[in-house]
């Protein structure tokens, strides 16, 4: 009889998703090894190591994923995060308009810096988890279940970037690392995904939007309360139709600003003078707060980032490989769900492993195919795919809403309709999450805004949120047709009453 041993998992990528995956599987009893291209973040200053990462907004889905592994981690993060109760719209005339995310329940999303989040998650990993930094995946021999890496003395590059000097300094791990399962948490340009596509027929798509993003900085203001020059409990948006500026608060009183602008418009801002005129025309209030020199210095020196949507299916191969986070489903950042969805992947995978009774130990030889684990990974890929496609679609839709629709009277009308209908036909409270069932609410009853379902209802899958919203849009259209309304008014309430039987069925 073969001797029992712990299953060996190799996780490629020690970002937030990779680190949480490592902690989750370690606590299940797996032998865990993690490879990361970049330097060890532990003990470093948590100031951003690069300026290509948009501030993160962590909300209920991400927090529930953290709690599913270790409740104390989620609570610790909330102490370092800043709650944002809504959007603060900055109009060109200087007026500001607050749009609450949850006018009835008062729930908030939370601003946190990516370096802090990542550092704290890596710090939470116990010594039993083998961490190898400055280690870059070179290739995977899936036939023999062995991964090979190269090592660098130090690196400050992003994944996917490598200078000629770095290439010469790399040394390959000739022995390689054997595994039962390799998990790709290595981002949009995943090398694990590339290796899987050589071993399995995988449908893959990527599409870029025509906008670049540039990170800017609003320093703290010593003369303002807490150092905040703007209300710290809002996500600030300067929507200008073709482009927009957003601002998320930091603990030190500063704001991380991000400009989203078409590449075609960006090409016209090729001098400091043209950039200054652009900011003065479209974002005068931001210029007044930040200062023109600081804003232009950041604009000139900071890199231009691309925004891409990536989908691949299946996201698992045999019992030996699976993709999580951006490696499987990179999305544009306009719904604030990239991080939350990636962390939720970990919770869903853990739930499916539990449902399939996957033991942390096995009597199979290292690297031998496990039919039961293969079924579990396939179940994850099949069940998760609809939700991943839905949130990528919703993120693209919100791309238009944030920069343009928030200025539309119809957007305000729809918000009022949602508020009235939610009061009249309140949906059932959030269902208790179960280890065996990641999304216990299979069908949302009553009326709930799309934003609430996506952001504050981790018991509801993204695909169900999208289905419900499409139906609610049909009801709103019906209400408008019945009443010819331009406000909620009596006709809207009448139509709501007419729709009551529908709502109870749906």
From Swiss-Prot:
Belongs to the aromatic-ring hydroxylase family. KMO subfamily. One of its GO terms (cellular component) is peroxisome. It catalyses: L-kynurenine + NADPH + O2 + H(+) = 3-hydroxy-L-kynurenine + NADP(+) + H2O. It is found in: Mitochondrion outer membrane. The gene is BNA4. Its cofactor is FAD. Catalyzes the hydroxylation of L-kynurenine (L-Kyn) to form 3-hydroxy-L-kynurenine (L-3OHKyn). Required for synthesis of quinolinic acid. Residues 153-175 are annotated as: Disordered. It is an enzyme of class 1 (oxidoreductase). This is Kynurenine 3-monooxygenase. Its main location: mitochondrion. InterPro entries: FAD-bd, FAD/NAD-bd_sf, Kynurenine_monooxygenase.
């Amino acid at each position: 009889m073969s001797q029992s041993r712990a299953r060996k998992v190799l996780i490629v990528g020690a970002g937030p998703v990779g680190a949480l995956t490592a902690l989750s599987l370690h606590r299940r009893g797996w032998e865990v090894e993690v490879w990361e291209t970049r330097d060890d973040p532990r003990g470093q200053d948590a100031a951003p190591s690069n300026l290509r990462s948009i501030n993160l907004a962590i909300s209920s889905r991400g927090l529930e994923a953290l709690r599913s592994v270790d409740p104390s981690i989620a609570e610790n993060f909330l102490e370092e995060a800043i709650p944002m109760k809504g959007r603060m719209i900055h109009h060109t005339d200087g007026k500001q308009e607050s749009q609450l995310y949850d006018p009835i329940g008062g729930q908030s999303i939370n601003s946190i810096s990516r370096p802090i989040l990542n550092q704290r998650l890596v710090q939470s990993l116990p010594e039993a988890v083998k961490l190898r930094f400055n280690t870059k995946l070179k290739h995977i021999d899936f036939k023999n279940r062995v991964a090979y890496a190269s090592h660098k003395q130090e690196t400050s590059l992003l994944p996917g970037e490598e200078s000629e000097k770095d290439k010469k300094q790399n040394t390959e791990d000739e022995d390689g690392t054997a595994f039962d399962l390799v998990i790709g948490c290595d981002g949009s340009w995943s090398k694990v995904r590339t290796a899987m596509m050589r071993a399995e027929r995988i449908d893959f798509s990527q599409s870029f939007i025509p906008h670049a993003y540039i990170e800017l900085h609003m320093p703290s203001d010593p003369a303002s309360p807490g150092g905040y020059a703007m209300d710290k409990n809002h996500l600030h948006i300067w929507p200008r139709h073709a482009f927009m500026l957003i601002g998320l608060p930091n603990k030190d009183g500063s704001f991380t600003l991000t400009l989203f602008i078409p590449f075609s418009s960006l090409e016209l801002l090729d001098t400091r003078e043209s950039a200054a005129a652009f900011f003065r025309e479209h974002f005068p209030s931001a210029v007044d707060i930040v200062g023109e020199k600081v804003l232009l210095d950041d604009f000139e020196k900071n890199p231009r980032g691309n925004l891409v949507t990536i989908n691949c299916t299946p996201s698992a191969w045999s019992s030996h490989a699976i993709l999580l986070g951006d490696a499987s489903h990179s999305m544009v950042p306009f719904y604030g769900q990239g991080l939350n969805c990636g962390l939720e992947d970990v919770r869903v995978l853990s739930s499916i492993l539990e449902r399939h009774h996957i033991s942390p130990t096995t009597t199979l030889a290292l690297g031998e195919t496990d039919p039961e684990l293969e079924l579990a990974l396939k179940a994850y890929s099949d069940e998760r795919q609809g939700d991943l496609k839905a949130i990528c679609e919703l993120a693209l839709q919100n791309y238009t809403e944030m920069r343009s629709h928030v200025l539309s009277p119809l957007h305000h009308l729809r918000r009022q309709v949602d508020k009235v209908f939610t009061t009249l036909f309140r949906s059932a409270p959030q269902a208790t999450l179960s280890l065996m069932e990641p999304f216990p609410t299979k069908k949302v009853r009553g009326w709930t805004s799309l934003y609430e379902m996506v952001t504050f209802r981790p018991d509801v899958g993204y695909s169900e949120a999208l289905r419900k919203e499409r139906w609610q849009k049909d009801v709103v259209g019906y209400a408008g047709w019945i009443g010819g309304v331009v406000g909620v008014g009596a006709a809207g309430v009448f139509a709501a009453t007419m729709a009551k039987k529908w709502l109870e069925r749906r």
